[in-house]
Amino acid sequence: MEFSWGSGQESQRLLLSFLFLAIWEPGNSQLHYSIPEEAKHGTFVGRIAQDLGLELAELVPRLFRVASKDRGDLLEVNLQNGILFVNSRIDREELCGRSAECSIHLEVIVDRPLQVFHVEVEVRDINDNPPTFPTTQKNLFIAESRPLDTWFPLEGASDSDIGINAVLTYRLSPNDYFSLEKPTNSERVKGLGLILRKSLDREETPELFLVLTVTDGGKPELTGSVQLLITVLDANDNSPVFDRSLYTVKLPENVPNGTLVVKVNASDLDEGANGEVMYSFSTDISPNVKNKFHIDPVTGEIAVKGYIDFEECTSYEILIEGIDKGQLPLSGHCKVIVQVEDINDNAPELEFKSLSLPIRENAPVGTVIALISVFDPDTGVNGQVTCSLTPQVPFKLVSTFKNYYSLVLDSALDRETTADYKVVVIARDGGLPSLWATASVSVEVADVNDNAPAFAQPEYTVFVKENNPPGAHIFTVSAVDADSQENALVSYSLVERRVGERLLSSYVSVHAESGKVFALQPLDHEELELLQFQVSARDAGVPALGSNVTLQVFVLDENDNAPTLLEPEAGISGGIVSRLVSRSVGAGHVVAKVRAVDADSGYNAWLSYELQSSEGNSRSLFRVGLYTGEISTTRSLDEADSPRQRLLVLVKDHGDPAMMVTATVLVSLVENGPLPKAPSRVSTRVTNAEASLVDVNVYLIIAICAVSSLLVLTLLLYSALRCSTVPSESVCGPPKPVMVCSSAVGSWSYSQQRRQRVCSGEYPPKTDLMAFSPSLSDSRDREDQLQSTEDSSGKPRQPNPDWRYSASLRAGMHSSVHLEEAGILRAGPGGPDQQWPTVSSATPEPEAGEVSPPVGAGVNSNSWTFKYGPGNPKQPGPGELPDKFIIPGSPAIISIRQESANNQIDKSDFITFGKKEETKKKKKKKKGNKTQEKKEKGNSTTDNSDQ
């Protein structure tokens, strides 16, 4: 007899699996391969690289790798040809048991960019396992009283294969008493068994030896067999019968040991020992069931014995056998199916699959940083996992596909603000109560050179005394770069430019690493008062970033120049001046005037005059103005006074220590009468008024024409130079509306003034003249240019004797002495509040931009008011003289329009300045002997102006 069966339930599962595959596979997007089990090492599985659309050359650079939750050594990929091959023995039964489907799930991961592919390799079953019985021999005890068609259960064979390979066909050796019976329902309540076809007779046949052979459906067929030893017994002809043939129980997982699962009950119609039933597990029960459950042999209670885990096994099938105590025991059988209910007892599991660290701070938003896989062994809502990040991080999670998240950049990074982030990923399932797990990763932000070196302030002011030693350290600049490593390494350098005819690098240098600024040569205040330059700071990044800082180096004056006497007339040198004075002059008559200039500035250039006693002079006869240098009589002269007076005038500055020079004035007293070279003012006023007016008009016209021509020529030359040369930054100082002045007592600022310096491309800046302006504009259209007081040899140049204002005024104005007097002396530390008299202009009220220096504070009273902008609307006509004149040595403003007896103007009261007088002299020299008298009158006017 032959019967083919694989259990009805397994047949249904197999059919459903085939239908599911037929429907699902066309829509599946992942790669699918199929290989038989027990394939040899190196067996070709598939060209995985080609199927995934990857080039062979990019497998290694993109870090092609294969990961598997199953045994990772079963399959391998050859990176040289992209072929997936069998790496080790694959036993389907070991890998998947009796599951209808068996697949190896692979995850193929490549970087740059990050990609994940799913590969499923189906392991096909082959007929490599023969069917086997639990034992090689089965003993059966059958009472002879058993009726025909009685069913005697047999333990069936098992085949580890599946499908057709597991379809078993049983065959019983030929006999007269028994036949094989297959199950009558799909739940396998009745399994394989023997059916009694002929009544037994113990006396005739006490024992029967049968062979049960099983054959599977594979190709080739494999067989197994068991020997059946049937012993014919007597009496006890009723076997135990269970209340139900099938018990179904639901049991939560994680229940404690001893928990009652179910109680089975079987009854036996026999009496006595033949009716007492003992319960036990069937002999063919799996060891796993024996480890998890225990049955009480008397009561039939089944209790939990081991750890019940839903994730390990979702259901248990227990075969229970009830045997009576008769001499010929009879048995009954039932089945208990324990269905394990899942509870939320597993927290989610997190794993970082791939990390791309560190991340550059300029990475674009959306950059993938890591791939995170999540897994929860629970089912249903207990296994539904959601992931989130800790707040305040510039990242977010993006669900790419089931159970996978990508950690991507959500906002811009700034390493200088935050150098690294600790990212904590929280995975939480949907159970109640919910379980959660965390995984953290430290994301380091790589620096990018996005910050230039920064100085604490855009400009620094440095004060350095002149005559410094070469290589002196004058300042240190420092810039800070917020970047790191080589992007924060700052080096310093000069922004090269020309200072006059020389390069800036010949004056100063900067140390590339420390930022120290050194003066390469001694600085001279008289040559260069302000040195303005820029220092550049650049980092070592690629590309390098940099910034500049401006340094204004003010060279402070030291008293290193002695006063220098100005020669009053050509041909007279050695500091000796000769003058003729009539004995008829009265007290206060100005005999001579000593003029000196000091190349220094401030108090170092503030000159004072003192008359020293010497042999042959009467000190009480003359006196000298303390700050004007004017020598005047103290009384009327008489016959008793010596005809020759030798005066020694000591000129010294106010430096510390003070420097001085001595001038000698020889005064000759003559009797009353006309002087050869110095006619009196009264006579000159009476006799030469008309000629003076004519000469003045002519000279004024000539001077105006000459100055206009010179101005046009200068503008043309300046325009040509500006068009042909690259403009460079002026060395005359910063275009700031604040002037910083230096002196022996310190430095200060004078607001609402602008210092005008005359710059030349060939010579050092001119420093003889300074103008003041109420305007804060940077216009330099009005620049005054005067000759330098010293030549290249260092000796004082001979000044133009026609300048009719004191050289000490020029030095004082250049060094802002009037500012010292108006500021420091007025409210200086430790000194009284002094009010210095001020010489005003000829205008009724000062105009805008008009500044007058104080009188008597080291500034000559012949100083004139500098202004630009509209002047006095009242302009003198041709031949007219100004209404007021500044008397040397006096703070008063004296009108010089004094009407004489004949209503004529005395030319000697008019003091000329600068080029007008020089033009007049040149004109007179051209006239020769014909205009000798006019020349003498002009010289007389000059002498009177000096006085």
Curated annotation (Swiss-Prot):
Q: Name one GO biological process term.
A: cell adhesion
Biased composition of type Basic and acidic residues is found at 906-920
Query: What are the recorded GO MF terms, alphabetically?
Result: calcium ion binding; identical protein binding
- The residues bearing each PXXP repeat, given as ranges, are 734-737, 774-777, 796-799, 829-832, 870-873, 888-891
Cytoplasmic topological domain ranges are 719-947
Where are the Extracellular topological domains? 30-697
Output the CDD domains linked to this UniProt entry.
Cadherin_repeat
Q: Which GO terms describe its cellular component?
A: endoplasmic reticulum; membrane; plasma membrane; synapse
Q: What is this protein called?
A: Protocadherin alpha-4
Q: What is the lineage of its organism?
A: Eukaryota, Metazoa, Chordata, Craniata, Vertebrata
**Gene label:** Pcdha4
